[in-house]
Amino acid sequence: MALRDQIRIMVVDDMSTSRGLITQALDAFGIRNVASTSDGPSALKALESAPVHLVISDFNMPGMDGLQMLHHLRTNAKTKGVGFILITGKADKAIIDKGKQLGMNNFLKKPFEPNDLRACIEAVVGRL
């Protein structure tokens, strides 16, 4: 069984269009076990009962940004080992450095191509 058949991914973005585009790309890669939500708090709640291998999260979201969510993931025993990819339109060095300090596994700058997303995922979880 291929990794793409086993991997579980959560997509977190306040923009439904972005969630849809990422989910479509994942589907094109053969990844079908995908959950999505529009904000960090609901993602954290969902992860308590439905763990995933990887979270792909937008940085700029109301209420709780992607780095705040990453901090919560890394300080919770149940989620500290979950892979994390940050997607941001602001790939400034301070954001990326803070993400690395918190345990971010990889990041993508918007806009990105589907193959860039695939390479980013494979760098975190292995070849799809």
Question: Model-found features: residue ranges?
Answer:
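Conserved acidic segment of CheY-like receiver
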Residues: 6-17, 22-26, 55
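Acidic, metal-coordinating helix/loop segments flanking the phosphotransfer/catalytic sites
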Residues: 23, 36-54
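His-Asp phosphorelay/catalytic-motif detector in bacterial-type signaling
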Residues: 51-53, 78-83
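Active-site residues of response regulator receiver
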Residues: 58, 88
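Receiver (REC) domain active-site loop signature in two-component systems and cognate sites
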Residues: 61
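C-terminal output helix
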Residues: 94, 112-121
